[in-house]
């Protein structure tokens, strides 16, 4: 028997985190309008003649100092973390506007 039935709308990081943390003795109903979980976070695959390139979008920044609760959660899930450089650039209007 469950303590409660809980509805969660959206499967972005907040919805997935809420579902995981509340799932103990509760029955969770996760509602997502899209055809996949993850909200804005997604891995895009760009196939080239040589090899595919994988570009992650949506997950803008992660550092242990500013996100201690998130850090603890991914460690509890045994998710590996790796060091990376953070960069951002934009090219629009055929190169008329570029930043980065």
What are the functions of these language-model segments?
Residues 1-14, 29:
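Beta1/beta-strand and adjacent pyrophosphate-binding region of the FAD-binding site
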Residues 15-16, 47-49:
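A generic local structural motif
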Residues 9, 23-48:
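Glycine-rich FAD pyrophosphate-binding loop
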Residues 6, 17-28, 76:
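A short, Lys/Arg-enriched amphipathic alpha-helix followed by its capping loop at the start of a domain
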Residues 13-18, 41-42:
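Short, flexible micro-motifs
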Residues 13, 36-37, 62:
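Hydrophobic pocket-lining residues within nucleotide cofactor-binding pockets
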């Amino acid at each position: 028997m469950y303590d409660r039935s809980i509805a969660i709308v959206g499967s972005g990081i907040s919805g997935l985190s809420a579902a995981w943390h509340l799932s103990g003795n509760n029955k969770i109903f996760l509602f997502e309008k899209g055809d996949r979980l993850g909200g804005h976070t997604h891995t895009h695959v760009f196939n080239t003649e040589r090899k595919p390139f994988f570009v992650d979008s949506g997950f803008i920044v992660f550092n242990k100092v500013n996100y201690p609760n998130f850090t603890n959660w991914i460690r509890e899930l045994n998710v590996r973390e790796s060091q990376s450089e953070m960069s951002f650039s934009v090219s629009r209007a055929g190169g008329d506007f570029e930043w980065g």
